[in-house]
Amino acid sequence: MVIVYLAIACGLGALVRYFFSRYNQASKLPLGTLIANLLGCFLIGVFYNHVESKEVYAILATGFCGGLTTFSTLNDELQRLLSDKKVFYSYLTLTYIGGLVAIFLGILL
């Protein structure tokens, strides 16, 4: 039954990411993907520190946050931003450093 809940949670996370993706058209920086990835990292930190059940953690962190965050879209967007080095490096730094900070902030809560 955990697999079913995990799949549902993944779909819900992907749906949330889809709504954030609307912000990608309004900015040079893909803000929707950045927000989705940082939120997913933060939530993984929160779940890591506050969810005791391994099954519930798997559903929330692997399922929901796995569907919410996106490594492939991030790298596709980075490839598209290569022509503007300043935006490229800003996005790369914000995503990876911001992701680590977000996880630690989630753990600290």
Swiss-Prot record:
The keyword Iron does not apply. It is found in: Cell membrane. The chain crosses the membrane at residues 1-21, 29-49, 55-75, 87-107. InterPro entries: FluC. GO terms for molecular function: fluoride channel activity; metal ion binding. Its main location: membrane. It is a multi-pass membrane protein. Keywords: Cell membrane, Ion channel, Ion transport, Membrane, Metal-binding, Sodium, Transmembrane, Transmembrane helix, Transport. The keyword Transport applies. Na(+) binds at residues 66, 69. It catalyses: fluoride(in) = fluoride(out). Na(+) is not transported, but it plays an essential structural role and its presence is essential for fluoride channel function. Pfam families: CRCB. GO terms for cellular component: plasma membrane. One of its GO terms (biological process) is cellular detoxification of fluoride. Fluoride-specific ion channel. Important for reducing fluoride concentration in the cell, thus reducing its toxicity. Belongs to the fluoride channel Fluc/FEX (TC 1.A.43) family. This is Fluoride-specific ion channel FluC 1. The gene is fluC1.
